[in-house]
Amino acid sequence: MNTVETSILTLAACAALAAVAEPADETATGRESPVRFDAGADFRLRQEIMDNLPGLPGGGPYAMTTTERAKYRNQMRFRPRAWFEVETGPLRLYARIADEFRYFPASNDPKKKRPYYFPDEVFLDNLYLDAQGLESPWLSAAGVESLDFRLGRQDMLGPNGSIFGLNRIVVEGTPTDGSRSFYSDMARTTLHFDETKQLDVFALYDSGRNDIRWGTSGSRGRSLNCINMTDSNDLDEWGGGLVYSQTALEGHLPFKLYSIFKRTEAHTKGSGANEIRVSPKEVTTLGVLLQPQFTENWGMEVEAAKQVGRICDGNREAGGHMAHVELRYMTDFLRAYKPTFSLATTYYSGDRHRTEPDDTDTAWDPMWGRYTQDSEMLVYGTLYENCWWSNMIYTKLKLTMKFGPRHGFYVYSGPMFAAVQDHLGRADHDGSTFKGVLSAARYDFPIRLAPKKATGFDRVEVFAHVVGELFNPGDYYDSSKPAYFFRWQVDFRF
């Protein structure tokens, strides 16, 4: 049975599960049931094609040969997931299992040498207990109107980005496996002081490997957090933080203040004679995010953060700084589609000597922001390996339009520079700080949307998107060939 046939059978099984798992509403006597059960599934099918992606042949721990990074890639990804939830009173228990296997149309390698070959592994993706709107006299005495909490394995990425609203800081707990999973093992509490003020308190732990899994031997011990592809799977990360959110000036000035700590544990890099022991690293990020809305048409986003930290083998300095400024304008032309222009610049500090022995590492540490922030393509290796957004200045002009539910479009383009010349982009350690011009466009569209409060097969939804990227490398890199990325995707939800 080939991969496509298997995916169709998986899809059918997911649909059957959804059909028999309708949400409980009322009992036959008309009284509300004290326990509500619901379940469902989703299936994601996508194909990704890319070529000519420049690497970092300049040496150090980020070395990658140009030919390895420029290699043509064509992969199909199949991700089935199934979930259930049980709710009673204010409490809810939610669980989800997932799998993702891949097919490589252009590969001649034996099946077992291909990553994520079928059936790969079924793993525990989410398992948490939560509650919302809890009230008590002792909370009121402390000035807290209500409390929410969520405890267990959960995603930090929600439908609108980071669950904390910090899309450059806290988003992804398992970056190495891409969008297969996003989870962290986390405890989170939200204190609501009134309708305009809240405080999020959280602590999390991300293991470098997932031991709650069932699958092929090739998937066992897969690294989930590695920075470089030669990192061992014992690269564990943990930390926590405080995020204070308030809406001031009658809703015209939402802002956030945050303090977030992260520790990356010791791990090994390479193997055999080339094995290197990497010391633990601790970083605390202090920042502010302002999102003023001047008029109905004009808005802005300003974020600034400073990191303080150390590499723990000798208290060497670690951590950098970040700034983001974005101006938005929604034109009245075609107003029903909310056409919005934005001009944004993002700055992540760099360290020109970070690859030298016994040196500091004062480049920006992306914390848990290691995901596809501005590019689907560049995270595959052009940015210090896996999603390591650092040492970068990127200015882009963007147009966004929204036509309806799950129906929208965006396009953006702009130049990208290295904040400092770290000589990683060229084998001769020469070149400039100009990394190139990155452009992208994406179109999302619905195929079938479910009506509100639909049950059974009526709640089946199908939606899709296509996205393309073009990167024209600058003198920072050895390569001058334009790199491209294309993806189509269809999602089925039950």
Describe each PLM feature range.
Residues 23-36, 59, 132-149, 168-357, ...:
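Signature for the C-terminal beta-barrel architecture of outer-membrane proteins
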Residues 354-391:
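Flexible glycine-rich, low-complexity coil/linker segments exposed to the extracellular/periplasmic environment
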Residues 1-73, 79-92, 337-341:
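N-terminal periplasmic/intermembrane-space "pro-region" immediately following the signal or transit peptide
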Residues 58-78, 85-147, 164-173, 224-226, ...:
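Surface-exposed loop and membrane-interface regions of Gram-negative outer-membrane beta-barrel proteins
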Residues 155-167, 345-368:
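Surface-exposed extracellular loop regions of Gram-negative outer-membrane beta-barrel proteins
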Residues 445-447, 482-494:
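Outer-membrane beta-barrel "beta-signal"
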Residues 94-106, 148-156, 161-162, 197-202, ...:
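Substrate-binding cleft and catalytic face of glycoside hydrolase catalytic domains
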Residues 439-464:
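C-terminal structured "cap/appendage" subdomains that terminate the fold
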